[in-house]
Amino acid sequence: MDSVKHTTEIIVDLTKMHYHMINDRLSRYDPVVLVLAAFGGTLVYTKVVHLYRKSEDPILKRMGAYVFSLLRKLPAVRDKIEKELAAEKPKLIESIHKDDKDKQFISTLPIAPLSQDSIMELAKKYEDYNTFNIDGGRVSGAVYTDRHAEHINLLGKIYEKYAFSNPLHPDVFPGARKMEAELIRMVLNLYNGPEDSSGSVTSGGTESIIMACFSYRNRAHSLGIEHPVILACKTAHAAFDKAAHLCGMRLRHVPVDSDNRVDLKEMERLIDSNVCMLVGSAPNFPSGTIDPIPEIAKLGKKYGIPVHVDACLGGFMIPFMNDAGYLIPVFDFRNPGVTSISCDTHKYGCTPKGSSIVMYRSKELHHFQYFSVADWCGGIYATPTIAGSRAGANTAVAWATLLSFGRDEYVRRCAQIVKHTRMLAEKIEKIKWIKPYGKSDVSLVAFSGNGVNIYEVSDKMMKLGWNLNTLQNPAAIHICLTINQANEEVVNAFAVDLEKICEELAAKGEQKADSGMAAMYGMAAQVPKSVVDEVIALYIDATYSAPPSTSN
């Protein structure tokens, strides 16, 4: 007791001494100056804290962006940028409408109704704008089924019955409600969901990812975490960036290892008290590589952090790979640490666009996704997803597709796609001007250039009728194989065309690209992100624009 008392007295004496010392030094300043200094210091501190919490980007990068935002307010800089953007706008509009043959545009309601024959004729004309051979396997991803007549016929009949149904009103549309519940449960069972598991139908993979992040944001807030962080590999889908932006979260990116899988040591190092979810991809979109889900799940269990598996791309491939003869690590709810999964039915599930499933290990976690207003004057308002009204027809045709295909058909398609994916990967590895990018674990083959500009390769492949996906950081392209590419004829044709183009470019030597993807990505690498964002905005605007020369 005496030692504690003595220590306390020493602390008190030291405190008094420093108090008088500080007070004596500050006494020479005007009190108003001290108040203003304290106020200014507090303001600077709060601004710095806000800047830190706003983004996971390095401070220097954010400072550079801030400095550029100030510079572009200068008349000379602003005028230069606006002039360049103005010159770019008509080019973008022209590129969007290049396949619009007649340049006619409907901008007002017709006074009298058009006949059904006229409408169908117009729809057929618009359909003919497409110049890529989708069914012939020339398009990477996009359309994941072969669109056979029997399936299309079934979809038409189902849509006819459920075109105006809306699961928001389960009492009015009990059949649509049941279809939605059955669709969710079928997919949950594919992913070995436990008895208490639950989920929702969404409009697509992006909404499924947003919903999962929204749930974990709400869970984090309930635990007192004010500034929740998503911890995801840098190859995770950009929908996580969108979710972080919409939900007021921060996204912390984890680097990859030599195989383009998440670096587990770095992931563990980056975990702190603000991390509210860990993310693994099965597979990721850029290279088609599956992250080590069992190990990520163990990290989640170790630190008590929910783990989300993004299986949007491979959602209707990976559950069937073992049966198809391709063994992969456990990716689903059999991992105790996995708490949620996103899975697109409208990709390899072969359903029409507009359906995806977000799944949760428990109803308790699912409840964090729900939104309700119990005291609204219009009555109690409650929705499970972002949407209020939901297209029951989208759920109905997805439900019908799963039932009409059955497990055996999905296994057959999976085996065919994986077989030809690996066949193509082997052929591409033999092309000396190409370097594989990541591992082709499921249905993607990604590659970069080895002495050739890979974006020029993409441009020239497009001229031969191949529509591929361009990647960046690093520069690469990929082809996503669907059932339409899963045959030797397409695989061989792709490999032959790719090698031929690489030979031509290698013989030509390094030259500056002035058009196409090569020019666009070259520009994007050299100008500030804010300017790139403005060009992107112009491009999106162009997709809603009338053709350059129109008559109503």
From Swiss-Prot:
Q: Per the UniProt entry, what are the Gene Ontology biological process annotations, in alphabetical order?
A: carboxylic acid metabolic process; sphingolipid catabolic process
Q: Which CDD domains match?
A: DOPA_deC_like
- Please give the function described in this protein's UniProt entry: Cleaves phosphorylated sphingoid bases (PSBs or S1Ps) at the C2-3 carbon bond to yield a fatty aldehyde and phosphoethanolamine. These bioactive sphingolipid metabolites are essential for normal development, intestinal integrity, growth and reproduction.
Q: Which GO terms describe its cellular component?
A: endoplasmic reticulum; endoplasmic reticulum membrane
| Protein name as annotated | Sphingosine-1-phosphate lyase
What's the source species' lineage? Eukaryota, Metazoa, Ecdysozoa, Nematoda, Chromadorea
> Cofactors per UniProt?
pyridoxal 5'-phosphate
Which keywords accompany this UniProt record? Endoplasmic reticulum, Lipid metabolism, Lyase, Membrane, Pyridoxal phosphate, Signal-anchor, Sphingolipid metabolism, Transmembrane, Transmembrane helix
Transmembrane regions:
32-52
Lumenal compartment segments: 1-31
**Which pathway does it take part in?**
Lipid metabolism; sphingolipid metabolism
Per the record, the similarity remark reads:
Belongs to the group II decarboxylase family. Sphingosine-1-phosphate lyase subfamily.
Q: What is its EC number?
A: 4.1.2.27
